[in-house]
Regions:
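ABC ATPase NBD coupling module
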Residues: 47-54, 106-126
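Short beta-strand immediately N-terminal to the Walker A/P-loop
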Residues: 70-71, 127
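Conserved Walker
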Residues: 81-82
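Helix-to-loop junction immediately C-terminal to a conserved catalytic motif
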Residues: 88
Length: 132
């Protein structure tokens, strides 16, 4: 799978800033064990009980256009921050892709090497971490 592709335009003509394609994030030492259970629509508790893995995000697809303001709302523990941390590859994506606009080229951060990730983190993605 290529780490770059031509930037797609949003419906209103703007370029896309970030694209999440069927993103799945699982925490634990054997995340692949959870995937078939996720596909069978088992609950987060059932997956953790059977595999010891913790489901963070299941099958999320979302596109954010350049200049768009997007709010992710949900209950505590629903995966909002987990999904956002995938933008700069701080959380591992076990299935799916996260594409980030790097000056006109979409970079798949799930497949990017360390040098590319460093560039994306320094010049394309800004993140303010939540405080408790």
């Amino acid at each position: 799978m290529s780490t770059t592709e031509t930037i797609e335009k949003a419906e209103d003509g703007r370029g896309n800033a970030v694209v999440f394609e069927e993103v799945n994030i699982v925490f634990g030492d054997k995340p692949q064990l959870a995937l078939p259970l996720m596909d069978a629509n088992q609950s987060r508790a059932e997956i953790q009980s059977e595999t010891g893995q913790v489901l963070g995000v299941h099958n999320c697809s979302l596109t954010v256009a350049e200049g768009e303001i997007l709010v992710l709302m949900g209950l505590s523990g629903s995966g909002k921050s987990t999904l956002l941390r995938a933008v700069n590859a701080l959380n591992p994506v076990v299935r799916g892709r996260v594409l980030v606009n790097d000056h006109g080229t979409m970079i798949d951060v799930t497949q990017a090497d360390a040098k590319t990730l460093r560039r994306v983190r320094l010049s394309c993605v800004a993140m303010v971490f939540q405080q408790f």
